[in-house]
Amino acid sequence: MKLKHLLYLFLALPLLWGCNNGDDVNEIFVSGTWNVGNFYNGGDWNKLNDGARAKYTKEDDIKALNYLTITFLTDGTIQGRMNNGTFTANWSANGDDRTISITQLKTTATPSGKSKELIEALKNAAYYKGDSNYLKLAPQDKKSYVQLGHYPE
């Protein structure tokens, strides 16, 4: 019986050695078009943002947010939709420390309102959390974030 347990242990060791604590960045980011869910303030980034407060709560505001989209492409570029135009940028993320860099952000029109908030959130994004269903981007201080998801329009 002990021999059987030892055999199972030795067979499982390669699986344990192959584990990686880092995120699969492409699985998370390149999982389709993301819609803006809301902007949040407060909360504790290290504790699943307990106590974070949504900036927008009215149904019309949420619909307007969901119209804003961002698509992370495997070639390191971004394509997005604002209320009055589109935007592009470059992105890179590190799955080990969950940092993100968004650079060379260009818009086809001057962003205003919620579009401006999204553009500013992307410019200031330094950290991310999430999976292929939801994504949170936070600035360096981690005191606010934008949440993205795959929401129906």
Question: Language-model features: where?
Answer:
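Sec-dependent bacterial lipoprotein signal peptides
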Residues: 1-17
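Lipid interaction determinants
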Residues: 17-153
